[in-house]
């Protein structure tokens, strides 16, 4: 057992050693490739920044610098150092002089203001002391105006007839009438007393035998009792397919996508914008120190360096493009005043004349022409109240006396009016006088027959009637048997039988419509960076001290300026 364990351990150790031997060269090659990529990226970055700085300096030289500040008066007394960086600016001018545009012409006059408030009333005028005679007019007559009488109205309708006069004198008596005819016969008298009953008849012969009768059907019988429970029903047929179900709920969010593939190698970036003043500093002397620095921080800073270089490249490309667009449209400012001592003292050989004499970090703004006339102004404020009016003059004008018009006493002659309406009916006249006595009446007609007389007395009772004949004997009847009655009403329903077996399950219904799509999954992990672009061409060599900081004395001049 121990030999087996030792053998297995030895084999595993040998496999591990072989794996390490194969892995170390691969790791070494990977580290070298990463190192080469970093060096290539730094080299490309350095070449691009050198090229951008050179182009920026060329553009800066073509632009006329702004007015130079006051020269230090002690420069002509004390000797300057040879390496004075006189070609560099003594201050940082990060913004050129802004153009001053003349104001546009004044706008048209505004709308007239609101009228001022009325002035205070003037002082009270002098009282008028002149007197006038009282004016009296004739009183107006209150009498009624007398007009002529109008025409009479039309005659009214005839009045109602008067009451009837009193009865006249009675006429002479007429002749006697003829005697009346005989009256109708009287009603018959009441029936007499009934006669005595007759003797009993002889018994009749025996009747014939009767036939067997058939009675009428009897009445329906009472409902019978409830029957026993029926047998269990047969199994039901399979049910029909169900209706399609409603749409299912939205699915859950999808799983995060896989990591994206590596991007295509980026194109070489364009030249970047110039940095701020003193942004470009000299590199340390010797390439060994830089190589040692990159080699020592390679495992830790490789990803950060590549990300920073990529972001910087994109930003510099965009900024440089915008600066070029602005630089083309810029009008250069006024050239600064020439130093009068340049012709007296010999200039240093290393003057850095190729560099600008100032740091112009912003393009010169264009000179603006006078703007168009402004819009009409706002309506003016309401005017101040006017001054009180002058004192009123006394009214010395005279007026003609007031005369009243004469009042006419004549009758107002009105035109004749239309005829009046018909008058009401007159009152009933008085009763007329008594009439004359009437003439004697004619002989009267015969009278009608008299009413029937009263019924006579009851008659004598009649004689007893004769005995009747004996009747025929009836036949003996047989006992009849009626027909069976109608069937009785159906009995109450028996108890329900046991439930039948369940039918076969119906087929599944159509599947419901697909639910809404789930939310998009989380974005996949970012793909690895693409291969670096091809290195750009070598840039132009920079001027001397192009990447050096301003000398310390620049701060003094900056404070004085």
Swiss-Prot record:
Residues 164-209, 219-265, 422-467, 486-532 have a biased composition (Low complexity). InterPro entries: Col_cuticle_N. Keywords: Collagen, Cuticle, Disulfide bond, Repeat, Signal. GO terms for molecular function: structural constituent of cuticle. Residues 1-30 form the signal peptide. It comes from the Eukaryota. GO terms for cellular component: collagen trimer. It holds the Pfam family Col_cuticle_N. Residues 100-112, 367-379 have a biased composition (Pro residues). Residues 100-134, 148-271, 367-398, 422-540 are annotated as: Disordered. SMART domains: Col_cuticle_N. Residues 102-127, 153-276, 413-544 are annotated as: Triple-helical region. Residues 485-543 form the Collagen-like domain. Belongs to the cuticular collagen family. Nematode cuticles are composed largely of collagen-like proteins. The cuticle functions both as an exoskeleton and as a barrier to protect the worm from its environment. Collagen polypeptide chains are complexed within the cuticle by disulfide bonds and other types of covalent cross-links. This is Putative cuticle collagen 145.
């Amino acid at each position: 057992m121990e030999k087996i364990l030792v053998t297995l351990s030895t084999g595993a150790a040998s496999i591990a050693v072989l794996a390490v031997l194969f892995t170390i060269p691969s790791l070494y090659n990977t580290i070298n490739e990463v190192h080469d990529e970093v060096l290539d990226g730094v080299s490309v970055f350095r070449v691009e920044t050198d090229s951008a700085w050179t182009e920026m300096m060329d553009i800066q030289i073509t632009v006329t610098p702004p007015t130079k500040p006051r020269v230090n008066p002690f420069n002509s007394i004390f000797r300057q150092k040879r390496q004075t960086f006189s070609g560099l600016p003594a201050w940082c001018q990060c913004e050129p002089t802004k153009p001053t545009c003349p104001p546009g012409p004044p706008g048209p006059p505004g709308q007239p203001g609101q009228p001022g408030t009325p002035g205070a009333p003037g002082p009270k005028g002098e009282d008028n002391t002149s007197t006038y005679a009282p004016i009296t007019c004739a009183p107006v007559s209150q009498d009624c105006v007398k007009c002529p009488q109008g025409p009479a109205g039309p005659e009214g309708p005839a009045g109602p007839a008067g009451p009837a006069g009193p009865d006249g004198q009675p006429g002479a008596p007429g002749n006697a009438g003829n005697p009346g005819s005989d009256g109708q016969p009287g009603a018959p008298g009441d029936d007499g007393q009934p006669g005595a009953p007759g003797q009993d008849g002889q018994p009749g012969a025996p009747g014939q035998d009767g036939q067997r009768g058939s009675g009428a059907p009897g009445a329906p019988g009472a409902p019978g009792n409830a029957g026993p429970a029926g047998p269990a029903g047969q199994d039901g047929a399979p049910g029909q397919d169900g209706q399609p179900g409603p749409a299912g709920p939205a699915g859950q969010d999808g799983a995060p996508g896989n990591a994206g593939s590596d991007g295509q190698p980026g194109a070489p970036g364009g030249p970047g914008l110039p940095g701020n003043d003193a942004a470009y500093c000299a590199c340390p002397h010797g390439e060994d120190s830089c190589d040692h620095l990159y080699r020592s921080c390679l495992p830790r800073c490789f990803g950060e360096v590549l990300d920073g270089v990529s972001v910087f490249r994109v930003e510099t490309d965009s900024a440089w493009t915008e600066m070029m667009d602005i630089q083309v449209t810029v009008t250069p400012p006024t050239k600064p005043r020439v130093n009068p001592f340049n012709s007296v003292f010999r200039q240093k050989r290393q003057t850095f004349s190729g560099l600008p004499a100032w740091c112009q970090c912003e393009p010169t703004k264009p000179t603006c022409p006078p703007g168009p006339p402004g819009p009409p102004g706002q309506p003016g404020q309401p005017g101040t109240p006017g001054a009180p009016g002058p004192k009123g003059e006394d009214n010395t004008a005279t007026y003609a006396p007031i005369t009243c018009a004469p009042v006419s006493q004549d009758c107002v002659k009105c035109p004749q009016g239309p005829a009046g309406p018909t008058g009401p009916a007159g009152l009933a006249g008085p009763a007329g006088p008594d009439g004359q006595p009437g003439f004697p009446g004619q002989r009267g007609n015969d009278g009608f027959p008299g009413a029937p007389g009263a019924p006579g007395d009851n008659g004598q009772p009649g004689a007893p009637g004769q005995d009747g004949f004996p009747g025929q004997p009836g036949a003996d009847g047989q006992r009849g048997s009626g027909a069976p009655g109608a069937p009785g009403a159906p009995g109450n329903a028996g108890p329900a039988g046991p439930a039948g077996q369940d039918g076969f399950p119906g087929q599944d219904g159509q599947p419901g419509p697909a639910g809404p799509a789930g939310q998009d999954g989380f974005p996949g992990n970012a793909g690895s960076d693409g291969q670096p672009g091809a290195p750009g061409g070598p840039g132009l060599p920079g001027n001397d001290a192009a990447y050096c900081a301003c000398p310390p004395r620049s701060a003094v001049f900056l404070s004085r300026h």
